[in-house]
């Protein structure tokens, strides 16, 4: 049984055992584009990836399944070298603890995503970045574009273009990096990990 066959079985829920860790060769490969129309397996895989993110953000399910919380997952992280990513970025509660009007600022499965334009301005998360495929903490600014325009296909073969900034832009760039065999810590300056370049946006 292939990896994708196992992952897309009806009863299977993606968990941390399915996620490969740094050092695995698939994480350093350039993933293949998917062809349209998608296979049923490719559609189901995208749905399972999104389901994993929802479970990881649900305190009850995360504890039950022993999941690390995540806002993005790329197919290579589950040992499927295809250009598929899922992103699920929740909106925060307001100052009084009320739930947001919209639960998510970004919720999508992207097939063959491609950055087609980006800002000159760079950005990095103040607290650095983490990754479900990296079990250690790696400190330093992960320097990325502050704003990006991304083209992608949905599961129905419809083409979309989205413009992202801030945390959403960071998340999508992190996941697209996985499709190109790039890990987040590749973008940290080893000599000066917390250097702030002129004009760089530091996101809290």
UniProtKB/Swiss-Prot annotation:
SUPFAM superfamilies the UniProt entry points to: Peptide deformylase
Known cofactor(s): Fe(2+)
Catalytic activity: N-terminal N-formyl-L-methionyl-[peptide] + H2O = N-terminal L-methionyl-[peptide] + formate
Cofactor binding description: Binds 1 Fe(2+) ion.
Gene Ontology BP annotations: co-translational protein modification; translation
Superkingdom: Bacteria
Cited InterPro entries: Peptide_deformylase, Peptide_deformylase_sf
Binding sites annotated in the UniProt record for Fe cation: 131, 174, 178
Keyword tags: Hydrolase, Iron, Metal-binding, Protein biosynthesis
Signal peptide coordinates: none
An example molecular function term from Gene Ontology annotations: peptide deformylase activity
EC number: 3.5.1.88
Annotated active site: 175
Keyword Zinc-finger: no
Alphabetical list of NCBIfam families matching this protein: pept_deformyl
Family the entry assigns: Belongs to the polypeptide deformylase family.
Protein task: Removes the formyl group from the N-terminal Met of newly synthesized proteins. Requires at least a dipeptide for an efficient rate of reaction. N-terminal L-methionine is a prerequisite for activity but the enzyme has broad specificity at other positions.
HAMAP family: Pep_deformylase
Protein name (database record): Peptide deformylase
């Amino acid at each position: 049984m292939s990896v994708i066959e196992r992952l897309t079985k009806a009863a299977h829920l993606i968990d941390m055992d399915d996620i490969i860790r740094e050092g695995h060769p698939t994480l350093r490969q350039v993933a293949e584009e998917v062809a349209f129309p998608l296979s049923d397996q490719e559609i189901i895989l995208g749905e399972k990836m999104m389901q994993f993110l929802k479970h990881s953000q649900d305190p009850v399910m995360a504890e039950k399944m022993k999941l690390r919380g995540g806002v993005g997952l790329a197919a290579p992280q589950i040992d499927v070298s295809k250009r598929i990513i899922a992103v699920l970025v929740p909106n925060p509660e307001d100052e009084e603890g009320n739930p947001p009007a919209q639960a998510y600022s970004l919720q999508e499965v992207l097939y063959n995503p491609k950055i087609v334009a980006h800002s000159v301005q760079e950005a990095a998360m103040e607290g650095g970045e983490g990754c479900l495929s990296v079990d250690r903490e790696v400190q330093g600014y992960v320097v990325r574009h502050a704003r990006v325009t991304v083209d992608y296909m949905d599961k129905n073969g419809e083409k979309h273009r989205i413009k992202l900034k801030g945390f959403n832009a960071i998340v999508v760039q992190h996941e697209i990096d996985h499709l190109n065999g790039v890990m987040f810590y590749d973008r940290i300056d080893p000599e000066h990990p917390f250097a702030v370049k002129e004009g760089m946006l530091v996101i809290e």
